[in-house]
C-alpha cells in the first residue's frame, strides 16, 4: 500500500467554521505538508526529538494540524491542551520547548511583558527594553532567516538568556 502512495493523494479535508457564510471544505494533499516539512527542515534546524510541543489550537485549525504533522515528522513529543481557558497553568505544567499559535496569543503575552516593563524604571527598564531589541534582531533578523547573528548580538543574547529571558520563560512556563 505504501508503494502506491503519491504526493498528490489526499491527506485530509479541513472545514471552515462557517462564521462568515457556508462552511467550506479544503482538500489538502500530502504534497502541501511535505513541502512545509522540507522548508522547516532547512529553517528549524534546532528542532529535535528531545523537544516537547503543546497544542493550543483545535486540531481542526490548519495551522495546528500542520504543526502537529511537523512535530510527528521531527519526532517531537506532542502534548494536547485540554483546558484552553487555563492555558497559562497548562503551559507551566507541560513546560513546552516548542509551541505554535495564532498571533493573538503572543500579542497577549507581549502586552503582559510590556505592562511589567512600564512598571519598572531606570537601569532595569533600559535592560528589559534592550533585551527585547536584541532578541528581536537575533531571532527574527538572523535565525529565522537561516543566518548567523553577529558576534556582538550573540554575546548580548547569551547575557540576556542567563538573566532576563530565563526569568521571563520561567514566569510564562516555557523554560
Q: Where on the chain are the PLM-derived regions?
A:
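Short, intrinsically disordered, charge-balanced linker/junction segments flanking boundaries
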Residues: 173-175
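Conserved pre-ATP/AMP-binding loop-to-beta segment of ANL
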Residues: 1-15, 22, 46-52
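Conserved AMP-binding/adenylation subdomain of ANL enzymes
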Residues: 34-52, 59-166, 171
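Conserved AMP-binding A3 loop
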Residues: 11-37
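Short aromatic/basic micro-patch
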Residues: 4, 27, 100
Amino acid at each position: 500500500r505504501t508503494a502506491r502512495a503519491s504526493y498528490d493523494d489526499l491527506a485530509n479535508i479541513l472545514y471552515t467554521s462557517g462564521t462568515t457564510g457556508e462552511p467550506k471544505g479544503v482538500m489538502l494533499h500530502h504534497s502541501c505538508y511535505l513541502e512545509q516539512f522540507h522548508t522547516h527542515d532547512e529553517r528549524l534546524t534546532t528542532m529535535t526529538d528531545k523537544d516537547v510541543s503543546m497544542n493550543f489550537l483545535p486540531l481542526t485549525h490548519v495551522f495546528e494540524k500542520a504543526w502537529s504533522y511537523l512535530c510527528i515528522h521531527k519526532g517531537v513529543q506532542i502534548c494536547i491542551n485540554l483546558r484552553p481557558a487555563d492555558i497559562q497553568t497548562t503551559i507551566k505544567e507541560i513546560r513546552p520547548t516548542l509551541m505554535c499559535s495564532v498571533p493573538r496569543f503572543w500579542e497577549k503575552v507581549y502586552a503582559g511583558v510590556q505592562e511589567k516593563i512600564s512598571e519598572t524604571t531606570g537601569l532595569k527598564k533600559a535592560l528589559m527594553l534592550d533585551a527585547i531589541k536584541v532578541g528581536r534582531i537575533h531571532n527574527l533578523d538572523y535565525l529565522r532567516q537561516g543566518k548567523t547573528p553577529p558576534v556582538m548580538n550573540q554575546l548580548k543574547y547569551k547575557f540576556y538568556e542567563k538573566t532576563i529571558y530565563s526569568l521571563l520563560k520561567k514566569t510564562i512556563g516555557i523554560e
